[in-house]
């Protein structure tokens, strides 16, 4: 009986420690990731590439407390105006900067919902289902028409 109790307590301890391990965040988002989303059929139209210098004010990253030097690289594709679809991958100098940027992207998405509620109401579900995913010091912003196609790449 004593051995059984020790075994059960050991198993419980092992399970507790495994639970503390946290969720694996996966590999960093890259330009290859971005291209995979573009090729996935998740968008209802062909998206146009935005200049990286446009992304800084568009996403209001400075308002989030970031400096331009903290953004290592950025690449984004966006609808020319017919839809609210877009995909962006941003890479920062550290995880804290990426956390701040994730908050800025949440604010950006909320502002897009407000701005498009009466103008393009059919786009609101896409914006409400927008994905902002941080992996280390990289971020993905995804506003897609086909969430199922996009979900396959988010795994």
Residue ranges and their predicted role:
Residues 21-24:
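Bacterial signal peptide processing site
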Residues 1-4:
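Positively charged n-region of N-terminal signal peptides that target proteins for export
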Residues 48-85, 96, 100, 127-130:
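Short, compositionally biased low-complexity segments enriched in polar/charged residues
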Residues 76, 86-94, 138-143:
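Second-shell loop/turn segments in exported
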Residues 98-135:
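Short Gly/Thr-rich strand-loop-strand
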Residues 122-155:
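A short, solvent-exposed beta-edge/loop patch
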Residues 95-103, 148-152:
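Short, conserved charged micro-motifs
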Residues 15-19:
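C-terminal motif of bacterial Sec signal peptides marking the signal peptidase cleavage site
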């Amino acid at each position: 009986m004593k051995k059984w109790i020790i075994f059960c307590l050991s198993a419980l301890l092992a399970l507790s420690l495994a639970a503390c391990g946290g969720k694996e965040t996966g590999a960093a988002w890259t330009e290859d990731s971005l291209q995979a989303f573009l090729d996935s059929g998740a968008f209802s139209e062909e998206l146009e590439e935005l200049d990286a210098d446009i992304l800084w004010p568009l996403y209001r990253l400075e308002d989030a407390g970031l400096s331009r030097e903290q953004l290592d690289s950025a690449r984004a594709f966006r609808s020319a105006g017919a839809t609210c679809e877009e995909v962006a991958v941003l890479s920062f100098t550290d995880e804290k900067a990426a956390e701040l940027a994730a908050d800025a992207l949440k604010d950006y998405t909320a502002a897009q919902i407000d701005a498009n509620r009466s103008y393009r109401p059919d786009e609101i579900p896409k914006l409400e289902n927008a994905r902002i995913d941080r992996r280390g010091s990289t971020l993905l912003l995804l506003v897609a028409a086909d969430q199922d196609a996009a979900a396959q790449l988010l795994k």
